[in-house]
Amino acid sequence: MDSEERSKKRLRLWSRAVVHFSLCFAIGVFAALLPLAATGATSIDSIRASFRPTVAATPPVPELDLLLIVTVTRPDDDDDDGMSQEASLTRLGHTLRLVEPPLLWIVVGAENTTATARAVNALRGTRVMFRHLTYAAENFTGPAGDEVDYQMNVALSHIQLHRLPGVVHFAAASSVYDLRFFQQLRQTRGIAAWPIATVSSADQTVKLEGPTCNSSQITGWYSKDSSSNITETTWDSSSNTTQTTWDSSSNKTQTTTLAALDTNASKQNSSSGPPEINMHAVGFKSSMLWDSERFTRRDNSSTGINQDLIQAVRQMMINDEDKKRGIPSDCSDSQIMLWHLDMPRHTPKIEQATPEKESLTKGDEEESHDMTLDNVVPKTEEHETLEKENLMKGDEKGSHDMMLDNVVAKIEEQETPEKENLTKGEEKESHDMMLDNVVAKIEEQETPEKENLTKGDEKESHDMMLDNVVAKIDEQETTEKESLTKGDEKESHDMMLDNVVAKIEEQETPEKESLTKGDEKETHDMMLDNVVAKIEEQETPEEGKTKEG
């Protein structure tokens, strides 16, 4: 009995415990599901959410504007089949590769099979999204300097046609960038401008140009040359427009008042065009190409290219004051983020009129004219002096030749009748007469030269020389008379005369050319000495013959 009662008591206890547990569990489940049913969330989602860590909500990432980078190629880049163009595009492409997307690179160039293939390969190698636009070179009929503007119009017409939204910037292939520049360029909402430094390798100078600002609003444009330290204001949008030139070396400012820029006046005088502005230092919103009234489309019927887009951008840069801002905000040139490398092609140097020559005043022209006359007069006098000396030498030579010709002619005239009348008995007399004639002619030839001799020693020395000549001739005649036979006298005498005349002529030829007024006496004495020497040389073989006879 006791065992049965105990088992019943245990069963009751367990039953009560199970009932109590079930009631508590049911109440707990009901209490937990009641608020979830009120919010409409499922129990599974609420349970999963209860186990997730709490994370602060991140703000949405703003969408960046598209950068439209336009690069025009130089017309002379095709001369080397596009090799220099390929190098420049590769360098710029790797710079743009570091810019945060989205970015579209538009490259414009003339149609050329080789150059186009090189350019496309270079663009593909940079892994930058690009579009390569070409145009027929024969369609461009303007001056060579306007072809760059024509290429810019090609790119702007493409952007306008396809309505590409973004910020347009003209990037030269030889430009160097600071990557912070592209971050500020994306913030453009109208027109932006910034300072740019142009480094010239040929002139070894740096030209700085950019906008002038007033509270981040662009009010004008200036240019500054490092070589002259002169700052020139190209245009100013204030009411009293002035063109200012400032020389930093002398701290002097020269100001010239100009006419104020007026929109109506600019429309009437549209042919003059807006002031020249470096388009590489300007950026603008592309939506202005189809939203603004200035960009009314006037296409070329053959090419579909709007020829007025680039000029409209320049005009808009001047007139739209509310939409312009500077980069950086204060337009300070102390922070330059864009450099342009000016690398001109090496061409043969052609002499051109320098600005100094073109700007010579009347006083400078008179001075240069006087200097030219001073240089011409001495040269003319020197030329006249040389001509006079040559004429005197020529006259002396001519007179001397005439004297020799007369001597020879007289000798021949005497020999001709004498030879015909000579007999064996008269040969001696004719020989003596011929010798006397030779001596007489020599004396006649010496007569004008004796006039130049001094009264003292010159006359005595000349007489002694003549006496020696006569003595030598007499000695020669004596020897010849004894040794010559009747048949040989005539032949030897003729040969001797021919030799004397030939030797005199040979000596006179080089001496005539070098005769001057002061040298006449010396050359005459040398000639006489040579005659005596030749006569002595002739006597030597004749004396040998005489001894043998």
From Swiss-Prot:
Carbohydrate attachment residues: 112, 139, 214, 229, 240, 251, 264, 269, 300, 421, 452
Instruction: Give me the Lumenal side stretches, as residue ranges.
Output: 38-549
Principal subcellular localization: Golgi
Q: Which domain of life is it from?
A: Eukaryota
Cytoplasmic side, ranges: 1-16
- Example of a GO biological process term: glucuronoxylan biosynthetic process
Bilayer-spanning residue ranges? 17-37
Official protein name in the record: Probable glucuronosyltransferase Os01g0157700
Q: Which organism is it from?
A: Oryza sativa subsp. japonica
